[in-house]
């Protein structure tokens, strides 16, 4: 019996050592493809003695991993849903939320598309599949090719809520794994349209359309219709290196990195809003 106790102690020690040397972060592609890796690199350069294991596979995976104990931090481009919170609670996980930055969902079209502005109603109708040809919104005749995120993405559902009044995407929409894939498809297809986070605008062959005259930018975060906060989540109040990294992300240095990557720093968003 005593030997079993010692084995358990050793296993616990090994688990604690891993938590101190490797920080596992799972979830949102919007946050995990650019922002969080750059925050992680800056944290290490400033003396953070930790390695990072970051997987950006969609916001929903933040909560499945936290529930399973396979992540110390979850990244999400939306608030946790009720069923995700219930899953975590059932596993004994108490979610703590940290607002890390503001994002803006930008509508991308091909740079050769003459359409430069859309109304909110037109955006809804395009992504719901009601408007099927660019000539219906003043563009060159041609069938609209629609690109969205996949169902594990927080942006997938967030866009339905913010831009589509709860309606589903058109049947011909093509689901992409990440922002960069959407930008690539739109950039190579003159009839393409999709959405990306603010940090992914300016991709080759694409341009951003204004929404009722408003271009997504730090200055328009209050007025742009598809602005949203983004979050990090932990299981309970963070401790140790997890706490150190969270604090780094939320301090002025972290806020500066947020802005450089292309997101809206939370301090700037708070002042404007």
Report the location of each language-model feature.
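Sec-dependent N-terminal signal peptides
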Residues: 4-13
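N-terminal export/targeting leaders of redox proteins
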Residues: 15-17
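Exported/periplasmic ABC-transporter solute-binding proteins
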Residues: 19-273
